Amino acid sequence: MLDGVKSKHILNIIFKNVKNKIKLKLLKYNNALLNRLEITEDDYKAYDSLKEFNKLFDINYSDIDIEEIDLNKKNIALDKVIYYLNQIKFKELKKLLLNSDYISDIKSLKDIQFNKLETLELSKNKISDINIFENVNMRNLKNLNLCENNISEIEVLEKVKFEKLKSLNLRGNKISDIKVLEKVNFRELKELYLSNNNITNYEILENVDFKNLEILTLGNNKISDINALEKFNFLELKELYLFKNNITDIEVLTRVKFDKLEILAIWENKISDISCLEDVNFKNLKELYLSKNEISDITVFEKVKFNNLEIITLSTNKIEDIKVLEKVNFKNMKSLYLSENNITDITVLENTKFENLENLSLDNNNIEDINVLEKVNFNKLKELYLESIKINNINVLQKVKFENLVMLSLYSINTNDFKPLEKANFKELKILQIYDNNITDINFLENVKFEKLEKLGLNKNKIEDINILSKVNFKELKELFLECNNISNIDVLEKVNFEKLEILTLWGNKASNINILEKVNFKKLKSLAIGQNKISDISVLEKVKFEKLEELYLNDNNISDINILEKVNFKEMKNLEIYLNDISDISVLEKVHFEKIEKLGLNQNKIQDITVLSKVNFKELKELYLEGNKISDMTIFEKVDFPKLENLGLHLNKIDLYSNALLISYLDYKIKNFTYAEQNLDD
């Protein structure tokens, strides 16, 4: 006779691989075989429950001995989840993910029977009351994620039995009082996330017993004074986040005992003086985030002891002089962000010792001359941001030695001549952004040697002729942005060799005829944006071969007839935008095959009758926009079946608020974002 472990293993194999239902029935009802394998009726009940579980949640688990169950984004009550989980008896379950957007009541957690559960995620829900945690049996819990809920009160943490807890995430709630933390028994805690709350008094952390704490986030609260940090006993702290507060003085950093600190994030505060960094003992610091402050003087960096620094962000400050960079000892520097300052002179870069630099951001400054780039020793540079500066030519790019460059951003500069790119040696380049430059001629693209290019941004220029695209060698291209130009003829798309193209944007041009789309070879296309043109006829959509299309933007055209949608083969469609047209009849929606659609924009048309909405099969629909039409009768919303609807726009129609008051009240309660009003745009 086989032992129980082997018999259950055999049962697992059978349920995973045997597709013949007759064999399953024979196995189930053959008592002799049952006895031989020592399989009990409870085992079968578990497997029956597993089938129901899979069906209910539209998933496919084949084994009850799994360690992780992911039910993210599933619209289902928690008590039903717990019921099935207990029925199936997932004895090995260690990780349960329930980030669904729908859960508000978690009282059923008291019934949970998973002794090995280590991770419970309930983030991005509507939970406000967590007192049930006092009664749950999760002694092995190590990670509890409750971020982005409506929690304001956390006193229950004093009573929970989570002695093995290592990570507690309360980010993005409404918590103001954290005094209970001095009473909790979380001696193993390594990560505490408290950002995006309403905390002003964080000094209580002076009394907590978190000797193993490695990560502390207090960003986006209402903290102005950080002097309490010197009393914190967090000797193992590696990451400290204090961003988006009202901090002005950081002198306390000279007295804190965070010798192992690797990341300090104090961006978006009101800091102007950073001279105290000279006396800070963060020898292990790797990342320093100081952007969006009021810093003008950075000479202190010559004296700091941050020899391991890899990332420094100084963007959006008041810095003019960066000459100190030639004196700093940041040999491991990989990312330097200096965008949105008042920098005019970057010649100092020639003398810097940033041999490992991978990312350099100089955008949105008053820089007129970038010729020094020819002399810098940035052989490992991968990303270069030069947008919105005042250079009148890019000739130096023919001479730079950035052979590993992957991303180059040159939008909004003072030249429309990009011919120098023909001689640039950027063989690894994958992203090129040259939009908003008044470019008219793109013939230079034929001669560039960017064979690995995946993303090309040519939007917001003055391009009329795109025929050169038939001659370019961009076989890896996945994203092409041509919006907001003067393009009227797109016939060249038939001849281009962009077999991997996934995103094509052509909105904001002058195209009226899109029949060429029937002949293009974009089998991997996921997003097509041709809104804001002069299109009236979309019958070609019946013939296109865009079987993977997920997003279609037809907005702001002259379309009145959408009946062709009945015949299109867009089974993956998730987002359809046809607003700002002349559509009055939407009865075709009953016949379309958009089972996966999540967003439908029909706003600002001439629609009166929406009764077809009760007949459509849009079970995944989350956003429906009907505002700015001529709708007066909204009673159809008593019958529609959109279980996941979160956003409904009905404002700027002819709906009478008084006669529909009850229905409006119901929809306002049921739908997260519901807008309505009486008048139409034409009134």
Describe the function of each predicted region:
Residues 18, 632-683:
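Leucine-rich solenoid repeat scaffolds
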